[in-house]
């Protein structure tokens, strides 16, 4: 159940990435230039994902992206988006608020998963090490 919820969070981040890019393109339709920022959703390992902002550069060699440093916590600092102009900046801030919530929920989910796995291991060890006697072997006077 915990892993299913985590998968849903990752899928939501991917949907937000795609939706953001489409909305950003719509804002740029009458303007010269390109969308200078995007959302990247990566899966560094089987049980994790990361949603972060990237700066997009266009050069003679083609397109390149650079990760924007978030620092600690779940939210990007306001100054991280100083290169983005309005009205795109407003869209970025709105999406960042939602992405920060997703990052926090994902982190809490992984912490809960880790705790549940540790508890499962502990209970499994204790059950396998315990020497339970059959209730039939308990003397009558000891049953309460």
How would you label these PLM feature ranges?
Residues 1-144:
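Conserved glycine(s) in the ABC-transporter nucleotide-binding domain "signature"
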């Amino acid at each position: 159940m915990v892993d299913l919820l985590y998968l849903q969070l990752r899928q939501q981040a991917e949907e937000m990435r795609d939706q953001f890019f489409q909305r950003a393109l719509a804002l740029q339709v009458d303007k010269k230039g390109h969308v200078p920022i995007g959302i990247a959703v990566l899966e560094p390992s089987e049980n994790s994902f990361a949603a972060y902002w990237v700066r997009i550069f266009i050069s003679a060699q083609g397109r390149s992206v650079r990760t924007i440093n978030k620092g600690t916590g779940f939210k990007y600092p306001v100054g991280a988006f100083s290169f983005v102009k309005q009205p795109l900046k407003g869209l970025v801030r709105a999406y960042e608020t939602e992405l920060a919530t997703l990052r926090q929920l994902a982190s809490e989910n992984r912490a809960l998963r880790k705790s549940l796995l540790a508890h499962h291991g502990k209970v499994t060890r204790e059950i396998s090490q315990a020497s339970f006697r059959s209730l039939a072997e308990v003397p009558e006077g000891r049953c309460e």
